[in-house]
Amino acid sequence: MRTAALLFVAPAVHAFVAPSANAPLARLAPLHVAPITVTTLDDAVTAKVISAELQEMLDREWIEQDCHVVIGQNAADAYLGARAKGLDDVGSILQHVGEQMTTDFPVDAYVGPWDCANFVSDTLVALASGERCECSSAPTAEELEARAAEFGSETS
């Protein structure tokens, strides 16, 4: 019985290798990624873009609902609140917007507050860096720049 157990366990033991002191430096050192900041964006214009784009995305993805206007405005207000508190990196703003939107979110919406906060962060990343995740429902950076121009200012 013990021999049979060893036949099954012995190969699995070799799968667990102790860390090597000779491992490449890339594996030993933590990866530092600089946060994306929104300091170059015009906050008033960015808030308008967030409100309009979020409302349009919700109308497009689901059905047109009056609560989408409220959600868009609440997201814009939460963004402005984050900026007023001095938050300038997208991660901190995402956290702030999500927390603010959970306090008073329309019950008739088909999405949740964190879905909307994630859309806001995707929009901010596209505006601030020009980058966009392919899985994002946020418009491209070029589309967002055109929308910002409609509101009277360039964002970057």
Regions found by a protein language model. Name each.
Residues F16-S156:
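N-terminal plastid-targeting presequences
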Residues M1-P24:
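N-terminal chloroplast transit peptides
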